[in-house]
């Protein structure tokens, strides 16, 4: 459905899991995130040593074509059924030239304070994304997810993984 909407506009492209070239630069998108405390679990994955967060809703849900599938034991489901971030990253298209590659990833890498929460001393970035960017060394990576990070005492809006600039 989202692809059909994007197709209606000349300059709109869904880059989730895809590569799109603009003026010699390749943009590669990835919209998955680690588990969060909210009920809607679309695009949620896990990592090997990830500890699930306390949930704000007793029931989780994953969207289907008309509604959403209710999951009553989310913690058990998240341990056994969720894909791993590293596997999602392995499936991304490869850039032709890493020095002109820009990864657009919803979730930030761990350890860079791009995912710093305001009210907890917690950086909730992804270890797998950090390792992926460290190995691939693209020109740039762009992230969202924790929009308050630059406004926190310890948070940052820009950092580096070797030659890769992460924003």
Residues covered by each model-derived region:
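Active-site metal-binding loops of divalent metal-dependent hydrolases
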Residues: 1, 18-19, 30-33, 107, ...
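Conserved acidic residues
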Residues: 12, 99-102, 139
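Conserved beta-sheet core of the metallophosphoesterase superfamily
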Residues: 16, 21, 111-167
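Active-site-proximal loop/helix segment associated with metal-binding centers of metalloenzymes
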Residues: 25-119
């Amino acid at each position: 459905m989202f692809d059909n909407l994007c197709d209606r506009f000349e300059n709109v492209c869904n880059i989730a899991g895809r590569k799109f070239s603009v003026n010699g630069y390749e943009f590669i998108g990835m919209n998955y995130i680690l588990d969060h405390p909210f009920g809607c679990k679309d695009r949620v994955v896990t990592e090997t040593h990830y500890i699930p967060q306390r949930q704000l809703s007793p029931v989780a849900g994953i969207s289907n074509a008309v509604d959403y599938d209710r999951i009553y034991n989310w913690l058990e489901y998240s341990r056994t059924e969720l894909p791993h971030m590293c596997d999602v990253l392995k499936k991304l298209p490869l850039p032709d030239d890493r020095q002109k590659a820009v990864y657009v990833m919803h979730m930030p890498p761990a350890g860079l304070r791009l995912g710093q929460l305001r009210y907890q001393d917690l950086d909730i970035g992804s270890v797998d994304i950090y390792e992926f960017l460290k190995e691939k060394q693209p020109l740039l990576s762009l992230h969202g997810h924790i929009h308050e990070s630059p406004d926190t005492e310890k948070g940052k809006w820009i950092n580096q993984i070797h030659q890769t600039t992460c924003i």
